[in-house]
């Protein structure tokens, strides 16, 4: 006997209906940033460079000018191949790769017996995203003549090699086709700065003290939540448990 066409048609119809109801898991772009921040504050944890130690404790305070830099990675890409270019000062703890949903840090200090502060740039490659994320900083020795500067930026897609000239460009130059950025003097106003492009956003804070602290968050832009770190995405998608009713 041949297959009865009405039965086959019914099976195909049911299959298509089921497939139509199996929507792919997609993060809604309407999720507000404040909710992402709330979840990230619970999910992002210290990596090996901060295991059992506070950020301030990384600074070598036997020197009067230091800077500690902390980066939180809220994106799904690893931040790899860190590269530091020091203009003034020396590195005391080196930057390392940063896994998704982790925070890592490193520290720098002034050079011994010099009248200079600490200044330089550090960058990480966004693994599989084919671009590099860059931080510029300057903590002065003479607070009356120089400011507390920080810059945040990112290279174009396809450019992953670090450049020794990024510090100078971000301190006193302007964005170009290879590197776009924003910068700010934190000497009198310590409000956050934000750099953004079509896919990513970087937010940074800097204190204006001799032992400066820089705290950075790299995250997807609000129309690109699919690039959030998996741990953050899972927490955002998790439905809250219904409140238990009390027995009368």
From Swiss-Prot:
One GO MF term: toxin activity
Chief site of localization: secreted
Keywords: Cytolysis, Ion transport, Membrane, Nematocyst, Secreted, Signal, Target cell membrane, Target membrane, Toxin, Transmembrane, Transport
Residues in the signal sequence: 1-23
Tissues where this protein is expressed: Expressed by the venom duct.
Coiled-coil parts of chain: none
Location of this chain's protein in the cell: Secreted; Nematocyst; Target cell membrane
InterPro entries the UniProt entry points to: Actinoporin_PFT, Cytolysin/lectin
Annotated phosphocholine binding sites: 120, 138, 140, 167, 171
BP GO terms, sorted: killing of cells of another organism; monoatomic ion transport
PTM notes: 9 isoforms are detected in the injectable venom, mainly corresponding to different oxidative states.
Region described as N-terminal region: spans on this chain: 45-64
Protein's UniProt keywords contain Acyltransferase: no
GO cellular component: extracellular region; membrane; nematocyst; other organism cell membrane
UniProt function note: Pore-forming protein that forms pores of around 1 nm and causes cardiac stimulation and cytolysis.
Miscellaneous comment in the UniProt entry for this protein: Found in injectable (milked) (IV) venom. The mature peptide contains 1 cysteine residue.
Protein family per UniProt: Belongs to the actinoporin family. Conoidea subfamily.
Subunit field text: Octamer or nonamer in membranes. Monomer in the soluble state.
Name by which UniProt lists this protein: Conoporin-Cn1
Organism: Conus consors
């Amino acid at each position: 006997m041949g297959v009865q066409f009405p039965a086959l048609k019914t099976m195909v119809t049911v299959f298509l209906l089921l497939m139509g109801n199996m929507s792919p898991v997609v993060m809604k772009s309407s999720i507000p940033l404040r909710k992402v921040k709330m979840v990230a504050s619970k999910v992002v944890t210290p990596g090996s460079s901060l295991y059992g130690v506070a950020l301030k404790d990384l600074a070598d305070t036997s020197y009067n000018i230091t800077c500690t830099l902390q980066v939180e990675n809220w994106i799904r890409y690893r931040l790899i191949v860190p590269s530091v270019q020091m203009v003034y000062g020396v590195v005391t703890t080196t930057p390392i790769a940063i896994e998704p949903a982790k925070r890592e840090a490193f520290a720098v200090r002034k050079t011994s017996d010099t009248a200079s502060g600490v200044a330089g740039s550090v960058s990480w490659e966004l693994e599989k995203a084919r671009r590099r994320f860059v931080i510029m900083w300057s903590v002065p020795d003479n607070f009356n003549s120089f400011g507390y500067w920080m810059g945040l930026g990112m290279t174009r897609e396809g450019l992953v090699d670090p450049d020794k000239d990024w510090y100078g460009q971000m301190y006193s130059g302007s964005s170009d086709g290879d590197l776009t950025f924003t910068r700010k003097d934190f000497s009198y106003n310590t409000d956050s700065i934000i750099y953004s492009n079509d896919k990513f956003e970087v937010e940074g804070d800097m204190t204006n003290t001799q032992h400066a602290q820089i705290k950075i968050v790299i995250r997807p832009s609000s129309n690109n939540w699919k690039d959030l770190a998996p741990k953050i995405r899972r927490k955002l998608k998790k439905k809250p448990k219904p409140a238990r009713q009390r027995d009368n």
